[in-house]
Amino acid sequence: MEKNTAPFVVDTAPTTPPDKLVAPSIEEVNSNPNELRALRGQGRYFGVSDDDKDAIKEAAPKCNNCSQRGHLKKDCPHIICSYCGATDDHYSRHCPKAIQCSKCDEVGHYRSQCPHKWKKVQCTLCKSKKHSKERCPSIWRAYILVDDNEKAKPKVLPFHTIYCYNCGGKGHFGDDCKEKRSSRVPNEDGSAFTGSNLSVELKQEYYRHMNRNSDENEDYQFSESIYDEDPLPRPSHKRHSQNDHSHSGRNKRRASNFHPPPYQKSNVIQPTIRGETLSLNNNISKNSRYQNTKVNVSSISENMYGSRYNPSTYVDNNSISNSSNYRNYNSYQPYRSGTLGKRR
C-alpha cells in the first residue's frame, strides 16, 4: 500500500531548462543603474538576452497625430484634418465641412459667397435677417423669463451703455462702426454686436440715432488741404515813438465797436471839480460853469499843510495865498529817481 502524503502537496511543475536566462535575484542587483541595465538587457522582464532572435523587443514610439511609429507628434510631417480626416490636404480651420453659411445653412462657403442670393433668412427669436433661429446668439443669453406685462411696456434703448469694440465709441455697435476695422479677420457673416439683432421697435430707434449722429459729424468735417498753402503775409506795423499819442489807449477805446461808458454820453452830468457836480440844466455854457463854482482855496491849502503832498515844510502866508496854483487833488510829481521834489 502506498503511503498517504496528505497534507503535503507534491510539486509537479517542470523544472527550468538550463538554456534559459533567469531574472537576476535581489542579491545580484547592484546600486549602479548602468550595470543593472546591462544585466537585464532588452528583455529585462522576461529574462531574454539581446542576441536572441525569438525575443520580443520593445516597439518604437507611436505618433498621436498620424498613428504611425517611429516619431512623436511634435515631429510628425503629416497634416491631419480633425473634421474630415484628410491627410496632407488642408488644416482643420480651412476644412469645407467646418464652414457653414448663415444664409442657406450649407457647408463649404460663407454668407458673402452664397450662391442662393434670392433666399431670405429671418430669425423668429430676435427678428434678425442675418441668421436663422438655430444660429441665433440670443439663445444662450436668455437667462430670465419675461412676463407679458413687461413686454407691454415701451422699450427704451440705453445708448449710454452701448460701446463699439472697434473704435471704443459710445452709442453704436462694433459691426455698424464707420471707422476702419482694426482686426484683420473679415466680418462677413456679422456677429451679435449689431443693430440688426434688435427688435423692430428698438431697431428703428437705433438706426434713427445712427443717422442723426452721422449728419452731425458731417458738419464738423473739413478739408485739410487749406493748411498745405503758404500762410498769408501779415501787415507790417510801424513803430511809434513814445511821444506819439495817436495810438493811445484812450483812442483805442473810442475807436472800439463797444458802446461807450456812461460818463462819455452827453446826457450824463460830468463833474468839473472833485466834490461838486453840475446842475441838470444842459443849456448853461462851459464858461458859466467854471465861473459859478465856489472853491475855498484857503481850506484846501490848510489841509495840505504837513502832508506829503505839501511842496515844502515852511509855511508862508504868501504861499498860502498863492496855493491856488496847485491842483486841488494829488499834486505829487516825483523826479526820475522817485523821490519827492522838495524846495530848499
From Swiss-Prot:
Something else known: Present with 1800 molecules/cell in log phase SD medium.
Similarity comment text for this entry: Belongs to the AIR1 family.
Gene assigned in the entry: AIR2
SUBUNIT field: Component of the TRAMP complex (also called TRF4 complex) composed of at least HUL4, MTR4, PAP2/TRF4 and either AIR1 or AIR2. Interacts with HMT1 and NPL3. The interaction with NPL3 requires the presence of HMT1. Interacts directly with PAP2.
InterPro entries hit by this protein: Air1/2_Saccharomycetales, AIR2-like_ZnK4, TRAMP_AT-DNA-binding, Znf_CCHC, Znf_CCHC_sf
Protein name stated in the entry: Protein AIR2
Region feature (Disordered): 1-23, 227-274, 312-344
Organism: Saccharomyces cerevisiae (strain ATCC 204508 / S288c) (Baker's yeast)
Record keywords: Metal-binding, Nucleus, Phosphoprotein, Repeat, Zinc, Zinc-finger
